[in-house]
Structures are given as C-alpha cells and as structure tokens.
UniProtKB/Swiss-Prot annotation:
<dbReference type="InterPro" id="IPR043141">
    <property type="entry name" value="Ribosomal_uL10-like_sf"/>
</dbReference>
<dbReference type="GO" id="GO:0070180">
    <property type="term" value="F:large ribosomal subunit rRNA binding"/>
</dbReference>
<keyword id="KW-0687">Ribonucleoprotein</keyword>
<dbReference type="InterPro" id="IPR047865">
    <property type="entry name" value="Ribosomal_uL10_bac_type"/>
</dbReference>
<dbReference type="InterPro" id="IPR001790">
    <property type="entry name" value="Ribosomal_uL10"/>
</dbReference>
<dbReference type="GO" id="GO:1990904">
    <property type="term" value="C:ribonucleoprotein complex"/>
</dbReference>
<comment type="similarity">
    <text>Belongs to the universal ribosomal protein uL10 family.</text>
</comment>
<dbReference type="Pfam" id="PF00466">
    <property type="entry name" value="Ribosomal_L10"/>
</dbReference>
<keyword id="KW-0694">RNA-binding</keyword>
<dbReference type="InterPro" id="IPR022973">
    <property type="entry name" value="Ribosomal_uL10_bac"/>
</dbReference>
<comment type="subunit">
    <text>Part of the ribosomal stalk of the 50S ribosomal subunit. The N-terminus interacts with L11 and the large rRNA to form the base of the stalk. The C-terminus forms an elongated spine to which L12 dimers bind in a sequential fashion forming a multimeric L10(L12)X complex.</text>
</comment>
<dbReference type="GO" id="GO:0005840">
    <property type="term" value="C:ribosome"/>
</dbReference>
<dbReference type="GO" id="GO:0006412">
    <property type="term" value="P:translation"/>
</dbReference>
<comment type="function">
    <text>Forms part of the ribosomal stalk, playing a central role in the interaction of the ribosome with GTP-bound translation factors.</text>
</comment>
<keyword id="KW-0699">rRNA-binding</keyword>
<keyword id="KW-0689">Ribosomal protein</keyword>
<protein>
    <recommendedName>
        <fullName>Large ribosomal subunit protein uL10</fullName>
    </recommendedName>
</protein>
Length: 171
C-alpha cells in the first residue's frame, strides 16, 4: 500500500474509528449524487458519511480493535461514523432506505458488538435518549405522587377518626 492517497485515506479512517461511538455500514449502489447529498444533510453534523475502499475500512477497523465487520465489507460500501445519538441516526438511515430502495443498511458496530442490519433497524424503533428520560421522569413523578398519597392517608384517617369520636362524645 505505497500509494500516498491510500495512506492518507487509511489515516483518516483510523482517526474516525477512534473518535466514533457507533458505525453503520451501508450499500449505496444505485444512488445518485443528489440522493447521497440529501442523506448527508439528513444525518447532520454528528455523523460523517463516507465512501471508502473495503480493504482500507477493514485495516482501519482491525487496528482500532473493531471486529466483526469483515463479512459486511463486500460490494460498494459507505460508512456512517456516528459521534452522537445512534438511535436518531438509525431512524434517518431506515427512513432513507424506505424512500430509496437502492440504499441498503448492511450492519454496524456499537458498544463493542457487531450489529446485523436487523439489529440496526431494531435500534431505529427505539426511543431516543431524551424521550426515554422524559418517560422515566414522568413515571417517577407519578410514583412519587402515589407514595405521598399513601403516606398522607393514615394521617387523614386518624383525623377523621378523632372527629368521629368527638362527634360521638358530644351526642
């Protein structure tokens, strides 16, 4: 690999793998430049979507300690390097794939595990972090209100009992 362009591309891929939390591999065969540009815009700033040679991706991934991608690196491959919320990116990729039949999610890598295409699509079905935290906070708030009601119930029962006893003595 004496080609300086390959060496520069490999160095860039290594840096991206080092900075990335999650990686999704896709097949872009049949997409126009306009469609690819549209996808990059939809992915946003937390995702770098790049076309790279499979051999360079294999080398960079292996040197970064990422295993399990070799079987996915066949045919034309583009890599989505995700720095932020993987769920949001998976949703964008899934929606784009539904709108553009030529686009295929091959699989990926997240939290030390290789992912199949089905697993990436399953991630797209999850709620993102903010929504999950909001649901959790709502559930906790409801539970706290119930607990407060339970703690106040004996005190109000004692007060009603005292009033009933007083009424009985007065009668």
């Amino acid at each position: 690999m004496a080609n300086p362009r390959n060496e520069a591309a490999l160095a860039e891929l290594k840096a991206r793998f080092a900075e990335t939390d999650t990686v999704v591999l896709t097949e872009y065969r049949g997409l126009t430049v306009a469609q690819t540009t549209e996808l990059r815009k939809a992915l946003g700033f937390d995702v770098q979507y790049s076309v790279a040679k499979n051999t360079l991706v294999k080398i960079a991934a292996n040197e970064a300690g990422i295993e399990g991608l070799d079987d996915l690196l066949t045919g034309p491959t583009a890599v989505a390097f995700i720095k932020g919320e993987a769920v949001d990116t998976a949703k964008v990729l899934k929606k784009f794939g539904e709108e553009n039949k030529a686009f295929v999610v091959k699989g990926g890598y997240m939290d030390g595990n290789a992912l199949t295409a089905e697993q990436v699509n399953a991630i797209a079905e999850l709620d993102n972090r903010e929504t999950t935290l909001a649901k959790l906070a709502g559930a906790m708030k409801g539970s706290l209100a119930k607990a407060a009601g339970l703690f106040n119930a004996p005190a109000s029962q004692v007060a009603r009992l005292a009033v009933a006893l007083q009424d009985k003595k007065d009668a």
